[in-house]
């Protein structure tokens, strides 16, 4: 199939492009953002930049929407309305943010659109009205078993941990003041100062490229995941694939993603601290639990399963539009 989309979340785009469908992207904006600019002139073989004129002459089979403004972009460039005369999926990456659990989704009651959620928790908490929904759990390329746990430190991987303070559980780091924490990610350099004086042992470890990040994470003995109100983070899945034991706040989708034997999982911070201390003190036990984490992540979040689920979703979207048109 020919799928029109925008490169909104790079990691998610990469997973989709691992499949066999053709993905179409409008050219970059004047600012240089968008299109296939992120690939630096070497995009995957099934990714193409196409003009609006080409899309009008040869419309895509499905448009994959991730932002509301893309609905108007389709009307503007293709002269077609998603969900009416163009099969459409709205990929909802996020948890609802207001009036939970009664939050109305922006495309609720649009029977011609299929909403795809990334977790069952999100599907449960968004009110989508008459709009059909399905869940496609993440698919993550296996970075390989790399865990060494050489450094008795915690890895904490969060983008914008200060701006997203309570959402990402950054405020909870103060409870882990007895442990050395290495923070990775966009704007994570702001975190050490933000948590002082309650935590003096948080260090910025870099905003690294994926392969460098995997190696750096795998050297830390435990992965710490404190997200309070987010969809399931890709970095947690990647940590598990690396073979890291994980200490996880039991919120949103964590109980489905993380077996208790994969490290520690609790909504009780005191329990989580005790378990984290034990994992740091016993590298062999950490390695054993990390292998459990890896098996669980590979089984649930494999790329082949992810791509198969998306094939079904694209076909369903086309059928939905035919039924309502």
Predicted regions and their residues:
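Short hydrophobic beta-strand element within catalytic cores of glycosyltransferases
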Residues: 245-248
